Amino acid sequence: MKRTACIMDLKNIARRRVPKMFFDYVDGAAWTESTKILNVQALNDIKFKQRVAIDISNRSAKTNLIGSSFRIPLAMAPIGLTGVIWPNGEIITMKACEEFGIPYCLSTVSITSLESLAKAASEPFWFQLYVIRDRDFVKRLTQRAEAVGVETLVLTLDLPLSGQRNRDIYNGLSSPPKPTIFNLIDILRRPAWSYEMLHFRNFNFGNLKGHVTNLERGKSLAEWTNDQYDPSLNWQDVKWIRDLWKGKLILKGILSPEDAETAIEVGADAIVVSNHGGRQLDGAPATIQVLPDISNAIAGRCEIFVDGGFTSGQDVFRALALGAKGVLMGRALIYGLGAGGQAGVQKALGFIAHELETTMGLCGVNSVSEIGPHNLHAN
């Protein structure tokens, strides 16, 4: 990783190192992947307004998110199956985030369980929750999160059923992975990954193991998710979670001002403007396109995060200028993990921070609180 300069360099290394079915799980999106592509294109279309002859010698990207101070306005987005990208992937990604100074969010469908991650943590981490059919299990999962010291719950709302991700179907992705000829050949072509994973051999969802019996029998991921996610999920369920959870509550998956208003009504401390990275509804707008309208509707009544297509510190600047308090990044940091483990995640975070701080300087900005629409050229 010595001769790397940006997230795309780490992505290319990860693509070569990680078996295709696992890389595609992270990198892929729903159907034609048009929304994933649009997320990136829409960000690139936003141009900065450069300013000169302004003292920028004391600039800082430090910020407060959900009542805590962090080095930059960034959080690790929840990503499932991180532990198959690198052994103990969730743990070492969390450690990289802790050392750098940003919050880490554990996914419900992680390889590492809440309890195992908590044993390795030195700072409180966030936990992302899916509402599945078994409400008693959902309740117990929130109680487990509280018991290990989680202070911020991220409730995902845009997955009442699973979007079709064609790459996962083509690759036959399952948990644990099925030993098909294609997959075995692909794994043999990745000796570095195979060597690292040889003694790990954990490919099940740590938070769900023992709860879903088909999980251990290698049921396909698409079949499993369609069986477990609950299409009856509604705002009364969200209110139920709000009543259960005494800590901070972030609602993820908001794409309209109307849903943002309802999120505030049920007691959300923050929302995430998100299209699930294009992994759910292909054809949905880019998150950066809908962010301004949602920000105007919220008018400061809760914090706004955004995700979807963000791969650089410049993208973070764009989001802040259009009304976000912070950005969640998933794929970008997992590319770092796949390229070089904990050191790769740290490298990715370093790229993002440097890009953000440099862009701030060239736009004449000394603190993230100064960033606004005036720093962008009107389209």
Model-identified regions with their sequence ranges:
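An N-cap/entry alpha-helix motif that binds or orients negatively charged groups
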Residues: 1-68, 176-233, 369-371, 377
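A gly/proline- and charged-residue-enriched helix-loop-helix capping module
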Residues: 99-120, 124-138
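Alpha/beta enzyme core
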Residues: 81, 95, 120, 136-306, ...
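Short beta->alpha linker loops
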Residues: 30-31, 108-112, 133, 255, ...
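Short, conserved beta-strand segments within well-ordered enzyme catalytic domains
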Residues: 47, 62-64, 73-77, 103-107, ...
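Glycine-rich active-site/cofactor-binding loop and its immediate structural neighborhood
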Residues: 71-109, 114
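Short, basic, glycine/proline-bearing loop/turn elements
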Residues: 75-81, 124-130, 222-224
